Regions:
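Short, low-complexity patches enriched in S/T/P/G
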Residues: 1-5
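Extended amphipathic alpha-helical interaction segments
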Residues: 114-199
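N-terminal Sec/ER secretory leader and immediately downstream segment
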Residues: 21-22, 26-128
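Residues that cap or delimit alpha-helices
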Residues: 86-87, 91-117, 139-143, 185, ...
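Residue-level detector of alpha-helical secondary structure
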Residues: 37, 47, 54, 58-65, ...
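Hydrophobic membrane-insertion alpha-helices, especially the h-region
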Residues: 7-22
């Protein structure tokens, strides 16, 4: 899988993780660090499916809060761990759940770009210019749908329709990716490298956001089964 495709997968999946760290807006965060989490559907599913992981993350956040860490510092510490968990779930989720998961990622990205190109870039590439918390910027109804998609994906990955990735699926995904990448390389020219080197996107924030959305828009235009295969392959090689 092309490195650019892997990076494109990382940035759009990573942004979804922040929904699990929504405690930042709750007045009880200092006295009861996990109180706000109890109302978060995705957090409840994690607790049900992997209680040891749930406790480890919860304990880590309590310690960081006591140390006076900022909201963004806690997000930056916890996000990679939850991302890894979600990537594993995507491998076993049915096609429709995988595609919906990515579709809502793209809807979030488009909504963030309507706020500003800079916010969109920070949303996708927090390591480059510093992140932005979408819970503070985007419409609540969109975030609710984002979180519901997370829940449905995680539950489906452990349900009776649990998916098994085959070598044929991976081979088909690689074949589907090639013309998409060629098309984008021709369209964007040298700027196509922004997918691989996002730090070069400073000053080209709009173009960087457009490129990520163009990439995944092309993937989502594929038939559902094949789009899901590309998504699974991209995140599996992160």
């Amino acid at each position: 899988m092309n490195k650019r495709m892997r990076i494109g997968a990382v940035v759009v999946i990573a942004v979804a993780v922040i929904s699990v760290i929504y405690f930042s807006q709750q007045p009880s965060r200092d006295s009861q660090p996990d109180a706000a989490f109890n109302d978060m559907p995705a957090w409840q599913v994690i607790k049900e499916q992997d209680p040891a992981f749930h406790k480890r993350i919860q304990d880590q956040m309590v310690v960081m809060q006591k140390e006076g860490k900022t909201e963004q510092q806690i997000i930056d510490a916890v996000q990679p761990q939850i991302l890894k968990l979600q990537v594993g779930k995507l491998q076993h989720a049915p096609d429709k759940n995988v595609v919906e998961y990515m579709r809502l990622n793209m809807e979030q990205t488009a909504a963030m770009q309507k706020v500003s190109d800079d916010d969109c870039f920070r949303f996708l590439y927090p390591a480059v210019k510093g992140g932005v918390n979408p819970m503070r910027v985007l419409d609540k109804s969109l975030m609710d749908r984002r979180m519901q998609a997370d829940v449905e994906m995680m539950r489906a990955a452990a349900g009776p329709d649990r998916h098994t990735v085959t070598q044929q699926e991976r081979d088909t995904a690689r074949a589907d990716v090639a013309p998409i990448m060629q098309k984008l390389a021709k369209k964007y020219g040298d700027d196509f490298q922004l997918l691989q080197n996002p730090s070069k996107g400073v000053g080209k924030e709009k173009l960087s956001c457009d490129l990520v959305q163009d990439l995944w828009g092309n993937v989502l235009d594929l038939p559902e089964e094949r789009a899901a295969g590309v998504i699974r392959l991209a995140v599996s090689e992160m």
